[in-house]
Amino acid sequence: MPVADTSQLISGVAERYASSLFELALDAGSIEAVGADLTRIQALIDGSDDLKRLIVSPVFSADDQFKAISALVEKFGFSGLVGNFLKVVARNRRLFVLPGIIKAFRLLAARHKGEITADVTSAHALTLAQEIELKAALKGVTGKDVAVNVTVDPSILGGLIVKVGSRQIDTSLRTKLSTLKLALKEVG
């Protein structure tokens, strides 16, 4: 199966699971709480190489994944809806799509609230004040409330890469250095 087909399959699975979770959260009136729990889960995944391995590796059995996720749910006190959802995902051997599920859920929640989503890549974690300022600037440009998904990528060296819909603004130091390098090659 070509890589493009595989990523579309994973994306489709993630969207179906996210849609199911969103509908349950909507019925329970807990979209915000579920979103907060999913943000905590994403932070746990980003902060733990062991958890990343558990999620993506086919070496772990469904039972091992279920036990680990159950322990995680208990330790961090995730809500009943999110806790049960994580256990179902683990039982069905779909933990590898969990980051995609989280992203798809955020998109559904933002759409429900009339927000648009901006994917922001930064060399360093943004402070709360920086995130608020960025949201305000993006709202001024788009005219809509903006939910920001921040990804830290030290390889961009500095600056930001902001994607809103089909538009991308790249003010990263890496891109500026690449542009300068090309300009110097043309001169010399």
UniProtKB/Swiss-Prot annotation:
UniProt cross-references to Pfam families, sorted A to Z: OSCP
Keyword Disulfide bond: no
Keywords from the named record: ATP synthesis, Cell inner membrane, Cell membrane, CF(1), Hydrogen ion transport, Ion transport, Membrane, Transport
Cellular localisation: Cell inner membrane
Chief subcellular location: membrane
GO cellular component assignments: plasma membrane; proton-transporting ATP synthase complex
GO molecular function, one term: proton-transporting ATP synthase activity, rotational mechanism
Gene3D superfamilies assigned to the protein according to its UniProt record, in alphabetical order: N-terminal domain of the delta subunit of the F1F0-ATP synthase (1.10.520.20)
Membrane association type: Peripheral membrane protein
Record function comment: F(1)F(0) ATP synthase produces ATP from ADP in the presence of a proton or sodium gradient. F-type ATPases consist of two structural domains, F(1) containing the extramembraneous catalytic core and F(0) containing the membrane proton channel, linked together by a central stalk and a peripheral stalk. During catalysis, ATP synthesis in the catalytic domain of F(1) is coupled via a rotary mechanism of the central stalk subunits to proton translocation.
Subunit-structure text: F-type ATPases have 2 components, F(1) - the catalytic core - and F(0) - the membrane proton channel. F(1) has five subunits: alpha(3), beta(3), gamma(1), delta(1), epsilon(1). F(0) has three main subunits: a(1), b(2) and c(10-14). The alpha and beta chains form an alternating ring which encloses part of the gamma chain. F(1) is attached to F(0) by a central stalk formed by the gamma and epsilon chains, while a peripheral stalk is formed by the delta and b chains.
Sequence similarity: Belongs to the ATPase delta chain family.
UniProt name for this protein: ATP synthase subunit delta
Organism annotation: Rhizobium meliloti (strain 1021) (Ensifer meliloti)
